[in-house]
Amino acid sequence: MKKKQKQHFTGKKWIAALVVVVLILAAIYYYIALPAINIHNPELWKFVLFLAVIIFALYALPKTTFTGDRRHPVNFSGNYKTKTFKFLASLVVVIAAAYFVGTLLSSPVINASKYQKLMKIEKSEFTKDIDQISYDQIPLLDKSSAEILGERKMGSLVDLASQFEVADEYSQINYKNNPVRVTPLRYADLVKWFTNKKAGIPAYIKIDMATQQTELVRLKEGMKYTPYDHFGRYLYRHLRFKYPTYMFDDINFEINEEGTPYWVCSVKKYNIGLFGGQTIGRVVLCNAITGECKDYKVEDTPKWVDRVYSADMLVNLYNYYGTLKHGFINSILGQKDCLTTTNGYNYLAINDDVWVYTGVTSITSDQSNVGFVLMNQRTMETKYYEIEGAIEDSAMTSAEGKVQNLGYKATFPLLLNIDAEPTYFMALKDASGLVKKYAMVNVHNYQIVATGDTVNDCEASYRSLIQSNGMGSDEESKKASTKTTAGTIKKIAQAVID
């Protein structure tokens, strides 16, 4: 009988098999993790380093061959001294070193001046920019209250409640000149996705933050591209395959003036080194129904889009501006002239744009504000107002103290202009999250506090208080007294830190 020939697993075959295994692992990782193929993407560097380590480890392991029923080691004649081994070892070291150096050279430690100049600040006047308008445009709810209304609305819809849930987006937007929150529905679970994927998500919820009217908007054609879908319809995968080099920031759910749902996908831009100085470079609008995407420069973004820059990004950029004036070391040790934002923010609607409001306080003395800033979420335009007064937390405590016998809790305040006086306005909620009263607190003097069961009652009481304290503008008060209905204060888009 002819003796069976032994099949040796040669070095070339081992390398070929190694390449195939690595490519398969890389494809699986890419499909699941969806890293942007961009030199500025830290996740891509980690991915490449991981692959290099895997290749090196597999190559360095002892190789074997299978011959019949016996296993014999293959002699690679000094494998660990080969050029391939040395190259792979060097590759791992070089990638790791490049990532470390790139991270260091991108940090505020070395680039404090560049970070401090990322945001341009314009000084302005409060009464000039913040006009007074009617109450019907003032939101009376915060996000948590909107969530309660959304859940109640969903619970009343028998035909949908068993298949869908309310997503937790609740994006704050201006819709036809009114402050509203919008959020899509989502599949209750994976099984519900399989049974409903053909039709898609049939509706979204819209809540008027001024009137508290909650509406389920049914769509003629369902949404098929969302973060709640799977496989090719999973929103992030859909975007990644269309834009493989784009690094997306937070994705926001909005509707255009016709009520069509879109995903506003801001594209990160790194301005300092490889990984530092993040702002926004472009905006991709993805139609949630059709999946059609359009790519815009930030300055060309359609006017109906309200959020290009997230509030957190704008706050971080201002903190760089306020703390790094005299370098990084001063921001940690001496802290001379260091200013920082307070621990909350809110949204104001001005000229159909949404602006982020937050107070500004000294790092060394954070019990009062030295001013506040407004930051445009669509353009990053930033205005600073030098107004000393109470921080928001103090105003909230004062308002709660006014009704301490009832145990109500204040929402994060809105900033209003009443009789040329900067004023904190907030809702007072009971333990179940329902709004029971409203409060106004003077920014300059947080001991001046007015409450009321309605906004009109609260405002009337507040006007009386500031006038009795010799504050406010007589001219503005006379204008207000001629109105027989709603009072006049600045249109604000209510929000709390998400």
Predicted stretch roles:
Residues 2-498:
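Soluble extracytoplasmic regions of secretory-pathway and membrane proteins
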